[in-house]
């Protein structure tokens, strides 16, 4: 009966993977070209609806910032909505709003991006507005004085007054001892207090150049029409010299690091992070895709190992998770977190030991082919359905290009995941889950003596 069940499960997983992988074999038509001023343009056709997403990505984020000047990239993102030579503060957003467009922006360690989602026949408006602020952002001192207070309040609400965010910020600063990834994207409060509009203007002049940007357009468009519009609105913006930007590399084995934080939280928790490569820095892409699947083996839903073994089985933790970013500009972290089950009297030390047991199990015993196939099918299904969105497609393209990789990898990654074997899982676990790569944060409820 057990053999029959295993064969049935294997057949189900095979039938699930086949149509998903077939989608990877027939990607949407994608075109790329570069303007004379260095602006790279990537167009991906998706004609299912008369809608288009336009994203402009700049190769600058918090990992580019130096001590004492943290938060500049995020602050500049805010100020990009505060007026250009043609338009006053907020006027571009008003125009887009009246056209029924969605717009926003985001900043990370590695990039800053601005996007609009709108009807295909309004694409010219979005590109004209985006080119205008690239060419002639004004950065008025009075607008900066108001906006920096908004940013400081954002930091208070999202980080300083939010224990989980504050804990991760401190943990990240310890886990990345050698690279700019230890810098919080929003910046340290001391640097926000001292930031000047002159610093922001210098940051804009240094990094906001067409030859440091990638325009991604996905939707009901063709390459020729986008090229005409890109030339019209961006073609006359001159290229500029951009500062050199080195890849953020970490120490391979910086040594075990530990911090204990006392915060205004009701329950204790812990984080464990291992210094590992990303796709841009790995010796082999197979290592990276193995780490992605390990994260899913541990925390890929109800039947994953952490909830099955530690949460419901041993009742050791109330919750546990695993997370890995495969696509930074430099090195990455593989992060585990857990909250011990205080109702059964479990401690942080016991929860940490339980997480270690799961990693050691992967080091000593490769997963079965059936378990790996099930997890891989979940990961592939998630990627396929996520890419059904034109916004997700554009974001994947922009992220890859901006961290120094090729957009073509998004059309190859399903096959790369399919190639990972149980032995690859075991090898990655053995190579990367070592104590000299480890950072640990224990978060405890604030004690009265520490107030």
Report residues per predicted region.
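N-terminal secretory signal peptides that target proteins for export/translocation
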Residues: 1-6
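An aromatic/glycine/proline-enriched structural segment found at the starts
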Residues: 177, 185, 214-280, 444-451
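M16 family metallopeptidases and their MPP-like homologs
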Residues: 44, 49-75, 89-133, 164-190, ...
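Short, polar/flexible loop-turn hinges at active-site or ligand-entry regions and domain interfaces
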Residues: 82-86, 134-142, 364-367
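Bacterial N-terminal signal peptides
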Residues: 9-20
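Active-site His/Glu-centered metal-binding helix of metallohydrolases
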Residues: 72-80, 294
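Boundary at the C-terminal end of the N-terminal hydrophobic targeting segment
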Residues: 22-27
